[in-house]
Amino acid sequence: MFGNLFEEDYSSVSSSQYGRGKKLKTKGLEPPAPREFTNLSGIRNQGGTCYLSSLLQTLHFTPEFREALFSLGPEELGSLEDKDKPDAKVRIIPLQLQRLFAQLLLLDQEAASTIDLTDSFGWTNDEEMRQHDVQELNRILFSALETSLVGTSGHDLIHRLYHGTIVNQIVCKECKNISERQEDFLDLTVAVKNVSGLEDELCNMYVEEEIFDYDNLYHCGTCDRLVKAAKSAKLRKLPPFLTISLLRFNFDFVKCERYKDTSCYTFPLRINLKPFCEQSELDDMEYMYDLFSVIIHKGGCYGGHYHVYIKDVDHLGNWQCQEEISDTNVNVKAPQSEEEANDPLVVLKTILLQEEANQIPVDQLGQKLLKKTGISWNKKYRKQHGPLRKFLQLHPQIFLLSTDESTVSLLRNHLTQAPSDLQSCEQILHTLASESPGLNDDTSCPHWFDINDSKVHPIREKDITQQFQGKESAYMLFYRKATLQRPPEARANPRYRVPCHLLKEMDAANILLQMRRAECDSANSTFELHLHLGPHYRFFNGALHPAVSETESVWDLTFDKRKTLGDLRQSIFQLLECWEGDMVLSVAKRVPAGLHVYHTLDGDDLTLCEAEVADGEDIFVWNGVEVGGVQIQTGFDCEPLLLNILHLELSGEGSKCEQLVESPHVFPANAEVGAVFTALGTPAGAILMNSVESADGECWTAVPKEDMKKTFREQGLRNGSLILVQDSDSDNNSLLPKQGRWTNSMNELNWLQVKNFCQSESEEKQVQIAVTMHTVVFDIRIKAIKELKLMKELAENSCLRPIDRNGKLLCPVPDSSTLEEAEVKMGSSVGLCLGKAPTSSQLFLFFALGTDIHPGAEMDIIVEETLSVRDCLKIMLEKSGQQGEIWHLRKMDWCYEAGEPLCEEDATLKELMIRSGDTLLLTEGKLPPPGHLKMPIWWYQPARLSGHCESRDHLNCAFSQDSTWRAAPTQGAPGPEPAEVSLLYLGDMEISEEATLVELKSQALALPSVSKLAVQSTALLRVWTVESKRPSRLLRTNWRQLKEYRLGRRAELCLELLQKEEDLGPRDVLLRTQLRIPGERAYSLATDLIWDTTRGWTAGSLRQRVADFYSLPVEKIEIAKYFPEKFEWLPISSWNQQVAKRKKKKNQDTLQGGPYYLKDGDTIGIKNLLFDDNDDFSTIRDDIGKENQKRLALEKKKSREVHRAQSSDLFSNAGVPARFRGPEASLSIHVASFR
């Protein structure tokens, strides 16, 4: 069971470091959840496809449509395997619809996916993320199906089932001539405005006549003149399935805006269409139609949600409605059958006897019980007999569990049963099934379900009346002819008329799902426990601590949480072969003072889940009494608290000067506060408390003498709290900080400022609420709403959001938390905003477009923490109005800079440690495949650098006329005139991280812009990384792989063209040197200098190399490094190095470290002391640059102040501009031609 867990070397028990954080378990893709008790499958929402799900479920629960589609075989529709072949005519939409219906019927999953179907629609621009009208989809989908089925036996499927005919007639009052026009309809559109119900509107449309008279006469063709006439319409041909679309959306011409009509509009469960038909000689039943589907829209005209009420005609689902059961429907059975039905042993034996090989997984046994009897184990037996697995374990004489307890079977002596026994078993199951509410086939109680995307719930037929009116009301009605009867073999048979190839595919998929669920369940059932071995611990300083080392004291054990505490105890006994005496397992916890034991794990028959043992739990293994001879107190009450105590001590021996000393002390939480005097050896005095770690600016509270007997916990102290102890003869105020204040009550109230951000017309803009650190956020919010005189409705749709010092609204705080838990400081400001705070499973995220943003420009969104990065990106793109697929997400760091991209697009936000309040950046550009880099390539031409092959003017001729230099100012590069770092964008390049530097150069030379330069060799190119729009790091060693440079996913490179080949060694440093012009504050052209640092990075070595290069005496030159971002020069001399030597170690005598940080590409100024002995290295441009920096800093300061003021007054005006709504996207389905 445990593999090599118990071998002597204990290789499976890690000696991990004690006190580390919990590991993040990387979860694989979990299989979809099985169907719930209704045994019906929903459809997963792709982001905005609730309208599609509702219509597809309606078609699926139209058996005649479903079976007609199933009747079309691969010989007519083709095969999905051939869809990518150029000459194959594969009708993808009907094939995907067949597969979806088969999955909804047979695949054991909570919800099916429509991704394959929407892909067959040709949706490639995130159409599934947009909301559309279901009535429009109904017409477009049927049109697409008709086009897809051209040339097959199902070419008239839609026309045969859904098309009807309306005839419009005009009768001349003079000659009685009838002029008529016939038109087909797919659905009847009926008005809602000013109409009470469906039957009234049908009367208006197909019973009442419109009279042409007076000023509105009709021109009769027979009479050839204007005459009186009557116009009417009738239903000439009725389809088997009648679709009715309610026109709830209208346009207000006064306000010039759309609105939804939410007035009451009734419709019958059965309707007689005979009064509205042209022919009425048929039997009345031919005109009767029964309602079987109602698509419901919740929301307004600019957005909302669809779900559907559906009648299960074939009784495919498990429908339960306890209120419909009459008291007379009581099963009178033999007393023996009732007693046996109540015996779980008999029931479970019966189920196992009906299984193949009389064996079944334990997890599926409960599902079988629910399916066959209609009642779950927990509901009928758990209270008396305990959990199912435990019940099986307690009856080993009947049930045989596998070694891993995953499957169960009957023992051999229980397998042989007489026919009478088998018949009795069937009767028992029938008895239970008949007792189960809702499983009796009562035809008088139709089976209706509410299908809301993935979720399916049974409803009563009378619940339909609730959808007559309101924001959530009926939008489409579907009726079927009452004469349509279903064959008996279709009843409760989901396999009826499903093609054989789809049956095989679904059976194989179900087997695979079972295997995946078993594997996932096994993987999810193991967790890690940290075993703290009692003999390796000692008790001192108020808590438990490792006696030798944490490695020997703490072991990690991976264990199955479905096993019992007895199994865990036995496993630990086997691990610790030398253990003597009793073994007690207790839950422990790491606290600041050390390790503390809380409670003992009792009940060896309880599983770890039932004992509430969590993943990563710390388990203390000991004898339950003492550790190292010291008796241990356990429990929450005596939890050790680490307190910081301030008290006066003499500053030294014989000194009378006292100083305030802070020292940590550990006390049990249930100890009296007066124990502080004992710990300090002080007989008596005064105690002042501060609940935070710093005394600066906080409130000190004096403990009255009568409260000295109270415990630390009763006084509200916690880990890190400060206690100030004063002798009884000292001045009470002498030790208090200047900002502190003396308070005599523990319950003194502080204030919290609440600002109104609800865009209301309330006169009050902000209020102060009296609070303590233990006040609940919900109470503060409700009180603020009352004092701001806002509407009571805001209590259900508002939240509190802290405001930072820049006026930005932060993440909403949960209603259930206290101010202390929410980390809201006293005296701070919070905003009362519209919208609910995120739940514990949701994240509140900020996001913004691009990478160059400033605080306050972000949008916000609330998403589930289990959402994948890909889905989160789609939602953010939709909300920001962006289109396309070339986007990715980056997490912004604390200084508002774009961080690394979120590459694992299938990982959840929770797995990537995304937290509420984080800011994500929508960055344009597609992420490269794993193991590849995608980076911009620039052409770099240093300004006026001597020794280079071409000038910039010449290079401009080589590039196209459309290419322009992007000049990034160097902020004062040295020279007689303004200089700039010039970068020309060449294009993006994607390359493998396994490629070498020389391969990168070769691939860069293939870029169209570079090929015009006709560079003869890769050795004539230097490659630099680009940071802050300037070259940063020089890449050398041609045969080194790119991954060794650790470029990162945000790397940018630039190429520099050389006049001659060079091969820099690992110790060569490239410097730009400039000789200062005597008598002027300027420098000559820059020249490249290669410095070999083999002898060290010393100032003397660099000075010697410069002197040799310029043929000058080394004692007659002075050199300095230029810092362009500061417009400053720092002289490099051996004297500076000597100062550094005295302050630091000798091995730090290097120019690589501070204050020079010398690297490739740095500018070195050189001064010839024979002609210029002035100490100044600066230029006129440096003076100008410094002035500009001062001016920019002042402007930024003013800008921040203005922005802060604007943020605080953001909602001060009552008028809020109308929300901009983008153009609505059209809905379309792309179908190939099959004519």
Curated annotation (Swiss-Prot):
Residues annotated as domain USP: 41-482
Keyword Nucleotidyltransferase assigned: no
EC number: 3.4.19.12
Pfam families reported in the protein's UniProt record: UCH
Domain of life: Eukaryota
Keywords per UniProt: Hydrolase, Protease, Thiol protease, Ubl conjugation pathway
Record: active site: C50, H305
Membrane-spanning residues: none
Catalytically driven reaction(s): Thiol-dependent hydrolysis of ester, thioester, amide, peptide and isopeptide bonds formed by the C-terminal Gly of ubiquitin (a 76-residue protein attached to proteins as an intracellular targeting signal)
InterPro entries: Papain-like_cys_pep_sf (IPR038765), Peptidase_C19 (IPR050164), Peptidase_C19_UCH (IPR001394), USP_CS (IPR018200), USP_dom (IPR028889)
GO BP term, example: protein deubiquitination
Family according to the record: Belongs to the peptidase C19 family.
Name of the protein in its database record: Ubiquitin carboxyl-terminal hydrolase 40
Organism from which the protein derives: Mus musculus
Lineage: Eukaryota, Metazoa, Chordata, Craniata, Vertebrata
